[in-house]
Amino acid sequence: MAQKLEAIGRGLQWDDSSDHDNVTKILVRGGREGIQYVKFDYVKSGQPQTGLIHGLSGRGGFTQTFEIDQKDEHLVSVEGYYDVTKGVIQALKFKTNKKTSEMIGYDDTGIKLSLEVKGKKIIGFHGYAETNLNSLGAYFTTTGPIGLNPQVGHIKLAYQGGGGGIPWDHGPNHNGVKRVSFIFDENEIRQWRVDYDDGGVIRQYEPINGYDMFEVKEYPTEYIISVECTYDDVIPRSGRRMIRSIMFKTSKGRVSPIFGYPAARKFVLENNGGALIGFHGRVGAGIDALGAYFSSFIPSPPPPSPEKLQPEGGEAVGDPWDDGIFNGVREIHLEDGEGIALKFVYDKDVQVTELKVHGEPSGIGFNEFKLDYPSEYITTVEGFWDKTSGNERGVITRLRFTTNKQTFRPVGLESTTSFSLGKEGYKIVGFHGNSSTDKLHQLGVYVVPITRE
């Protein structure tokens, strides 16, 4: 099933749907007021699909196209800028696994938008439009359990075992193997069934109900990387060699039971951690020989788990609060009066989230610090806290934020005790703390390792 990144906006809703194989051509029409319309062409089951215009044509401006070679190229992300006042997308930029378009449009200011899911490709668009393009969302699907199209990047390992029976081949055009079922006796693997993931649809080969089954529990983040087989003569010195046992290993270190009865001769099918995406071999009364298709690329490691750093400041008085974990921080809003009040604007899967104020605003007005998200992120927060009259258990009096690109000016007053939040090699993706009705007492952060994009 395709993953849908939502688009919310004014105008009329449109939806190209998620049942395409790939995006092949993009047409963008723009003018001074923003993007006037977009049109996307697709391929579905090998056949070209011409898309509809979303927006209004027939006005002055410019038209640009961006073409994608469906043979070995796919769309991975879209970036752009959105004018909140006009409610119109101002510019768009498209990126495939091979190339990136220029920023299409006149205005590269406003809120930056990004449509991207790591390890997935875009197969459809939806959004809102009227006289202009008001918003844009996308449908994503896996390009294989390792983030590539298995039809493009795979290797075929020759079958091994006996020479009897007839050849068979399931092919490499699958995302991965979900489960395998077996019927076997003391002499051979007699029958089996392989359940492949074909773009979210489970396709079965050899429709039997096996006595024993191996299932990849956490597919698609877990996948088979190794198949170990043994084979030998079914009858001693008969020369009729058959596969006698099979065992699997996964990307998360799990090892299956041995299916069948091990024999003396052994071989292993694997490709340096690549994902198993298909089988072939020879078959007669049982499985005579077995070979496999593996992805020719190594998967990227899964995203790191966030780490919660304990809050700093005074005592844990008032009410605890927790903004949660996000992809990153877009804006910081700080106000200083008798203490610090703050709020953050976050990004979570392209959705902008502005959370409530922590601490009581004094009415002076917030200082706003905007990050160049997603390329800019917070690395450290430095601050001071103190015990004051009426706040003997401590309040935060000053904060200063540092990113990978700059250090923002501090807000508030220095006091007796300083603190620092952050971790070397990590970025901040969320905040938590303690505050009462009018004071911020403690501040803590969530961090994740900085990875190369």
Curated annotation (Swiss-Prot):
The keyword Repeat applies. GO terms for molecular function: carbohydrate binding. It comes from the Eukaryota. Keywords: Acetylation, Lectin, Repeat. Expressed in roots. CDD domains: Jacalin. GO terms for biological process: response to abscisic acid. The modification N-acetylalanine is found at residue 2. InterPro entries: Jacalin-like_lectin_dom, Jacalin-like_lectin_dom_plant, Jacalin-like_lectin_dom_sf. Residues 1-142, 154-296, 306-449 form the Jacalin-type lectin domain. Induction: Up-regulated by abscisic acid and abiotic stresses. Regulated by the microRNA miR846. Abscisic acid also represses the expression of miR846, thus increasing the accumulation of JAL40. It holds the Pfam family Jacalin. Belongs to the jacalin lectin family. This is Jacalin-related lectin 40. It comes from Arabidopsis thaliana (Mouse-ear cress).
